[in-house]
Amino acid sequence: MQVKVNLENNTSYNVYINELEKLNFDTKVVILTNELVAKLHLDTLLEKIQAKELFIIKIKDGEEYKNLQTIEYILNQMCAYKLDRKSLLISFGGGVISDMGGFVASIYQRGIEFINIPTTLLACVDASVGGKTGVNNKFGKNLIGTFYQPKAVYCESRFLKTLPSRELAAGMAEFIKMAVVFDETILSFLENLNEDKFLNAKLDDITLAQIIQKSIELKASVVSQDEKESGLRMLLNYGHTFAHVIENQTGYKKYLHGEAVAIGMNMANVLALNLGLLSEQECQRVQNLLAKFKLPISYKISNTHEFYNAFFLDKKTHFQKINFILACGLGKACIKNDISKEDILRTLEVFA
């Protein structure tokens, strides 16, 4: 099963679903992974790879390590291994690894090729596809980064079988995001999906592959039309404006990214409801679906004005205008940058 991401300037690539066979490289290869993934799956991957020379860099697991300090460590290791411009980097892990691996590949010797092999559902359905790379700093999430496309992406169901239910649910949040923004029919599919099988990693490979394929097809279509996020691609940030503030305020430790996105989607829906863009029934339907997959939908805001001011560090804020991605009915979304401060604060007060 393959999905093509069509891009200009000879940067198109394929996403392969359950098609990882032998990978042979006539160059030096470095695998970037974390300690947990290495323990669970690295031996399986190593059986698939042949290279002129093969190196492994392991980092600690967690969003709190997605920073410039870790990037410097990775770059120093790559220099020590004498990797050159013809070398290849393989990002083998979740969204944090794919974000950092892509960023490192984009800046090491001004750019080397890289491949994503995601090991979380969230990375399969979202983070590993599209070319967004980056790290966090004390001011916010992904404020330092590049657009840099992978050479290929390999999504394998076998690597998802060891995921705890919380990680699977976090990935589902990004799929629900796609449904609300682009395709209402997915909501019905998910409402009929057996959540117990899904959350216990017992969903059959065919259904799991269908979820991954559908999400990637939607994202590939968007990225093909708007690679650098100048318009249409911004819709993929539905829920993220709120989520990034939540993640930053909690030090990237309390919530997985998908969990923060779930809360952010609910907050965005409350704002859309208050503006008359979304009905109460539609808002409730999304809430119910998030709850079905054991995702959080609420966050206690201690200071609404502080939360509001954090929006101005969001990458979608232009000329001091906050661009909110809101559902305008289910299956479609819109960008709103003319919402009054009063309306925004009124929504934040619901969660205070």
Swiss-Prot record:
GO molecular function, one term: 3-dehydroquinate synthase activity
Domain of life: Bacteria
E.C. no: 4.2.3.4
Principal subcellular localization: cytoplasm
Record InterPro entries: Dehydroquinate_synthase, DHQ_synth_AroB, DHQ_synth_fam, DHQS/DOIS_N, DHQS_C
Cofactor note (record): Binds 1 divalent metal cation per subunit. Can use either Co(2+) or Zn(2+).
Reaction(s) this enzyme catalyzes, per UniProt: 7-phospho-2-dehydro-3-deoxy-D-arabino-heptonate = 3-dehydroquinate + phosphate
Originating organism: Campylobacter lari (strain RM2100 / D67 / ATCC BAA-1060)
Protein name: 3-dehydroquinate synthase
Record-linked Gene3D superfamilies: 3.40.50.1970, Dehydroquinate synthase-like - alpha domain
Family: Belongs to the sugar phosphate cyclases superfamily. Dehydroquinate synthase family.
